[in-house]
Amino acid sequence: MNQVDYLRISLIDRCNFRCQYCMPEGSELDYILKQQLLTDEELLTLVQEVFIPVGFRQFRLTGGEPLLRPRVVDLVGAIASLPQTQDLSMTTNGFLLAPIAQNLYDAGLRRINISLDSLDPHIFDQIIGSHGRSRWQQVWDGIQAAHRVGFDPLKLNVVVIPGVNDHEILDLAALTIDKQWHVRFIEFMPIGNGELFGDRGWVSSSQLRQQIRDRWGLTDAQVRGSGPADVFQIPGAKGTLGFISQMSECFCDRCNRMRLSADGWLRPCLLNETGQLDLKTSLRSGVSIHQLREQVRHLLAIKPEINYKGRDSGTTGAYSRTMSQIGG
């Protein structure tokens, strides 16, 4: 069994984008009230006194959009400064990144993933649900700022949506040739948006790899991180290409993570809502730290039984939360 030592922490469920695959435009979202969010103190208590003692050493900050969280730089610094923290990273849409990229780096953040689903501003704005002023340039500025500051690896996440951005695969892959950037193609996963995307299906990673192989060739490669991507490289390129194939190539048997939602629910599996723990309510009602640790230890022990091991389009309507509410 894989050691589960990686926790994805959603700092906030709100986002300044409304990406089609994450927060479908037709969906009704009930945002978490501020008083229902884990406070900074509660979050740090859980990290330091519950998660680290049971073996978690790697942490990724997500959202919603994590940069919308007040005092996010201070929170990064607090987690990064814990001696047991072996790796701290963040996934962001990049829109608010440029002005604070250096501050985040100075606080101890070293790895960052930025969503970039299109190089075409019009398509990009369509995907993110932008109405009015284009947001592409500000995201691109955030990527450039992260590059200048020295985040390494700097990963760009691309969710491949059939008929929307799948014609840009080669252009996006080419970003890795001259810069040490790492472009990761993610198979579209219909969670909480089955009605919107049910007829579109998804493009498999093997198809994407073949497109790139036919153009430049591909070799096996590696990049620092603990994610599920299969990593390749265009011969002679400075960066790498990752393929996350959660729909076509089940990787549940090598899952090493759990997810903590912004309102304190610990979720052992992205695709299975069984076994979630409401840590915030337990913490606020006076349950001892020892008891919380034991609950998490038990969840770790049964995680292999909970892991979702199928891929069936019939499950798309079975999720009570969208990607933005889960934390991706």
Swiss-Prot record:
It is an enzyme of class 4 (lyase). This is GTP 3',8-cyclase. It holds the Pfam family Mob_synth_C. It comes from Trichormus variabilis (strain ATCC 29413 / PCC 7937). [4Fe-4S] cluster 1 binds at C15, C19, C22. Binds 2 [4Fe-4S] clusters. Binds 1 [4Fe-4S] cluster coordinated with 3 cysteines and an exchangeable S-adenosyl-L-methionine and 1 [4Fe-4S] cluster coordinated with 3 cysteines and the GTP-derived substrate. It catalyses: GTP + AH2 + S-adenosyl-L-methionine = (8S)-3',8-cyclo-7,8-dihydroguanosine 5'-triphosphate + 5'-deoxyadenosine + L-methionine + A + H(+). One of its GO terms (molecular function) is S-adenosyl-L-methionine binding. GO terms for biological process: Mo-molybdopterin cofactor biosynthetic process. Residues 1-229 form the Radical SAM core domain. Signal peptide: none annotated. S-adenosyl-L-methionine binds at Y21, G64, S115, M189. Keywords: 4Fe-4S, GTP-binding, Iron, Iron-sulfur, Lyase, Metal-binding, Molybdenum cofactor biosynthesis, Nucleotide-binding, S-adenosyl-L-methionine. Monomer and homodimer. [4Fe-4S] cluster 2 binds at C252, C255, C269. Its cofactor is [4Fe-4S] cluster. Its EC number is 4.1.99.22. InterPro entries: Aldolase_TIM, Elp3/MiaA/NifB-like_rSAM, MoaA, MoaA_NifB_PqqE_Fe-S-bd_CS, MoaA_twitch, MoCo_biosynth_MoaA/MoaC, rSAM. Catalyzes the cyclization of GTP to (8S)-3',8-cyclo-7,8-dihydroguanosine 5'-triphosphate. Belongs to the radical SAM superfamily. MoaA family. GTP binds at R8, R60, T91, K155, R257, M258, R259. Pathway: Cofactor biosynthesis; molybdopterin biosynthesis.
